[in-house]
Amino acid sequence: MANLRKTHPLLKIANDALVDLPAPSNISVWWNFGSLLGLCLATQILTGLFLAMHYTSDISTAFSSVCHICRDVSYGWLIRNIHANGASFFFICIYMHIARGLYYGSYLYKETWNIGVVLLLLTMMTAFVGYVLPWGQMSFWGATVITNLLSAVPYVGGALVQWIWGGFSVDNATLTRFFAFHFLFPFVIAAATVLHLLFLHETGSNNPAGINSDADKISFHPYFSYKDLLGFVAMLLGLTSLALFAPNLLGDPDNFTPANPLVTPPHIKPEWYFLFAYAILRSIPNKLGGVLALLFSILVLMVVPILHTSKQRGLTFRPLTQFLFWTLVADMLILTWIGGMPVEHPFIIIGQVASVIYFTIFLVLAPLAGWAENKALEWT
């Protein structure tokens, strides 16, 4: 008699995705980040659910309800710290996952890649509305500044901003709807993740060599299930260590002050994982231009598959493009640093140069390097 997991309509789906899935035998630890993102999402939904049980989305009580969670709710401080720092780990895993995709040419699975970019945008939106909920100074002013960017949309901008605010400024209506969105989006992300996996399993995983691995596949369980488990332990160790020993390390001190519309903080800046995009936004001295650059800094990922010129898939055997990849990584770090700095010399010019380099690598240098490497292959 056939095994139940192979015949049962529901178990069969799980079996084909998690047990009997044929996986390339040579995928490295860089392929762990997909499952880690699944763990991050599950952790955020669970901790978020428990926080939502005690949180009130009203401007008069939001800040004190967060204080109440940390002081009076059993292990509330732990749940909140894991949720806040879990977002940071979520974005670390996302950026590693995208970097892996760029390095090894995984973006050539176009549907999987484009759903991934949509997932990134959804996650960024979720994190943004979530940051507003504690209703501290940086929550309020961050919401004001970022939503105000929509006023740069020609003709309908002003009306659009007021529609999102639910009034003439960031107020109670804004907080209430942001809480509703923050509760809803993770489930949209979970649904999009299922699509992401569905399209991935149509083709199977890519591998570090960038060649067809049909001749050498191994089953997902036990090999990669245990490998993923090791990743889970490592990440949870890092997350709990941060949440227990330095919970406020990555936060902004301004958010310990309740929101005050009459006092503007000296430096309005988002959480660290948005600083690179914030630096690109600020590097253009024009509102609409800045907003478009901000948008395109993420959407540029969608044109990467179109601009792939190389005959090889990954960068494993392509030293020229490898150099460009690591230049891009360094450039992202510089942009992250600049995003947290005040708008003054020399930070302005550094940010502008780094922004130009960011787009040049994606749109000009990487396709040129691929073409040059093809030429070099012809000479041998």
Curated annotation (Swiss-Prot):
PANTHER family per the UniProt record, alphabetical: CYTOCHROME B
UniProt GO cellular component terms: mitochondrial inner membrane; respiratory chain complex III
Residue numbers binding heme b b562: 83, 182
Subcellular location: Mitochondrion inner membrane
Name of this chain's protein: Cytochrome b
Further remark: Heme 1 (or BL or b562) is low-potential and absorbs at about 562 nm, and heme 2 (or BH or b566) is high-potential and absorbs at about 566 nm.
Cofactor: heme b
Residues annotated as binding a ubiquinone: 201
InterPro entries assigned: Cyt_b/b6_C, Cyt_b/b6_C_sf, Cyt_b/b6_N, Cytb/b6-like_sf, Cytochrome_b, Cytochrome_b_C_euk/bac, Cytochrome_b_N_euk/bac, Di-haem_cyt_TM
Membrane topology of this protein: Multi-pass membrane protein
Coiled coil residues, start to end: none
Species, as recorded: Salmo trutta (Brown trout)
A molecular-function term among this protein's GO annotations: ubiquinol-cytochrome-c reductase activity
Family from the record: Belongs to the cytochrome b family.
Cofactor note (record): Binds 2 heme b groups non-covalently.
Ranges annotated as spanning the membrane: 33-53, 77-98, 113-133, 178-198, 226-246, 288-308, 320-340, 347-367
Keywords: Electron transport, Heme, Iron, Membrane, Metal-binding, Mitochondrion, Mitochondrion inner membrane, Respiratory chain, Transmembrane, Transmembrane helix, Transport, Ubiquinone
GO biological process terms, semicolon-separated: mitochondrial electron transport, ubiquinol to cytochrome c
Name of the gene encoding the protein in the UniProt record: mt-cyb
